[in-house]
Regions:
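N-terminal active-site segment of His-dependent metallophosphoesterases
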Residues: 1-69, 149, 162-163, 180-182, ...
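Short, flexible hinge/linker loops that cap or flank conserved catalytic cores
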Residues: 11-12, 72, 117-118
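A general structural motif
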Residues: 15, 55, 75-77, 120-121
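Glycine-rich, low-complexity intrinsically disordered segments
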Residues: 60, 81-84
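Short, electropositive alpha-helical surface patch
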Residues: 69-82
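Conserved beta-sheet core of the metallophosphoesterase superfamily
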Residues: 79, 86-184
Length: 187
């Protein structure tokens, strides 16, 4: 269980791991234009189902493509943060929860489809960018999970946290408190 998740999202980690991935673009015709090494929907599904299991939560950070592949993922919870190519009506029966995003799931983690810039106090986990750009020049910490960028492998949120990805992320509450203290001292 990931205790730092905000209450509405804690059930995602009650019975298993939380895995995230973006931009699968299952069966979309123009994938090879984004990346000449793009693999097929079937190959992606094989990777995903080999990692995400029945008690896990699978969070798709948008641009799903053909929804028929989502039904093959055996996760307990399937969550979608809609991407710029997604329509809610196409996926309403395939995902347990749908969000238009961006979505703060803890005081230090923002999930979204597109990168959100200017928030220096949180980790933004997103997709949308099919390049392997690591820095967006905005002082923010980003993790790009576009499928072709992360090897088509869903990433475990618990493992990221355990490996220290949040170690240099202060969180909104700490920054807000520090700013309030500075204002009080000045005034």
């Amino acid at each position: 269980m990931i205790q730092s998740l905000y209450e509405p999202f804690r059930h995602w980690s009650e019975t298993g791991s939380i895995y995230m991935l973006a931009d699968t673009h299952f069966d979309d015709a123009d994938c090879k234009l984004m990346d000449p090494e793009w693999i097929t929907a079937e190959e992606q599904l094989e990777i995903i189902t080999g990692m995400v299991h029945r008690n896990d939560t699978f969070i798709h950070l948008g641009d799903v493509g053909n929804g028929k592949y989502i039904a093959e993922i055996r996760a307990k919870n399937k969550i979608l943060v809609l991407g710029n190519h997604d329509r809610r009506s196409d996926y309403a029966g395939l995902f347990d929860e749908l969000y238009t995003g961006p979505l703060f799931i803890s005081d230090r983690i923002l999930i979204s489809h597109e990168p959100v810039c200017g928030l220096t106090w949180c980790l933004n986990i997103h997709g949308h960018d099919h390049s392997r750009q690591e820095a967006y020049g905005d002082g923010c910490k980003h993790l790009n999970l576009a499928a072709n960028v992360c090897g088509y492998r869903p990433v475990s949120l618990g493992r990221l946290i355990k490996n220290g990805i949040l170690s240099d992320v202060d969180g909104i509450h700490r920054e807000t408190i520090d700013k309030a203290k500075k204002i009080k001292k000045i005034g």
